[in-house]
Amino acid sequence: MSQANLSETLFKPRFKHPETSTLVRRFSAGKPQAMQSALSGNHVDHWYRLINRLMWIWRGVTPQEILDVQARIVMSEAERTDPELFDTVIGYRGGNWIFEWAKEAMQWQQKAGQEADPLLSGRHWLHASNLYSIAAYPHIKGDELAEQAQALANRAYEEAAQRLPGSLRELEFTIPGGSPITGFLHMPKGDGPFPTVLMCGGLDSLQTDYYNLYENYFSPLGIAMLTIDMPSIGFSSKWTLNQDTSLLHQHALRHLENVPWVDHTRVAAFGFRFGANIAVRLGYLEPQRLKAVACLGPVVHGLLVDPLHQGRVPEMYLDVLASRLGMHDASDEALRVELNRYSLKTQGLLGRRCPTPMLSGFWKDDPFSPEEESRLITSSSADGKLLEIPFNPVYRNFDHALRQIARWINHRFG
């Protein structure tokens, strides 16, 4: 089936689809405050979703494109679940978040199909993949339209990978007691086996969101990157996140000694946000398989155990946590009790000495991940490095931090 036909088949006009903000039915205790975070985006009035401009621009979406799509959503007069929230238009139609971002993606998909230059066509496919991923954001389980957008993001990513430099292989990993999962191994030019970074993304992202990380930071150093979806989304959608947060990534890590393109003696883990929970956990459980662990804005303890901290983060993020845990109808109190078990300190790991070298980067006053979170990680490591990232200029400092982290990992590979 052609990509255009697939889009038409998946996105038939229907108005019965549940609207994203209604899928998690937690008891909300109050009105969220405005919030700004480099890594997770801004919570601004009248939007349910966090507007994550830094990460979207970093992935290749232009600021103008973001504003254009937002404007179409704002201007819509269609019925909304909450009249106060722009991005709650009901049904797949003009003004609906998924509709508008998928419509933008389809334009780039069409450009890709018409472009004769393979490299440029690959860029267009990658752009379409990023836009489909934003359409599906924040990837809440049971969001039918979002799951269709995820499927299109993955298809577009596969098309892009065939045309862009280097090579990409889809690897299937068998997980005992459940469905296998698929990961993408991105490899630079040259002969392998390559030192490899296992990417552990955030709870509100797909594994296809990190191509830029590979292309601009790891590939130039001759490092490959393996991505895996977080439990309950994408290729890992049949799994629910549980207290053994690193289960899927751990099985993938153990399998790498059987992958001929990977130098399994030189593997590191890199975690964004909750992905750092997985990466640090692996640092404790698999020190013989990991040369290093790096984290950015980690969520490993504070947010998971402190109700006041939880009260400072937006509803959307708590909805995402509840969704990953399969707690769509839980009270806030039940969610708090469960989240406490996901703290790596509560689990008896953080605070104990870990032989794996660990770097943790943080932004001052980050509502998701205060400085103490990163200090807890680095002070627990026999070879810890703390990296403070100045907030402004936000894009340049983010880029600089990623370059420092890539060099640090490369140095640990030896």
UniProtKB/Swiss-Prot annotation:
GO molecular function, one term: carboxylesterase activity
Pfam families cross-referenced by the UniProt entry: FrsA-like (PF06500)
EC number: 3.1.1.1
Record's catalysed reaction(s): a carboxylic ester + H2O = an alcohol + a carboxylate + H(+)
Keyword Lipoprotein: no
Catalytic EC class: hydrolase
The keyword Endoplasmic reticulum is annotated on this UniProt entry: no
Keywords: Hydrolase, Serine esterase
Function: Catalyzes the hydrolysis of esters.
Family matches, as HAMAP family: FrsA
Protein family according to the UniProt entry: Belongs to the FrsA family.
Record-given protein name: Esterase FrsA
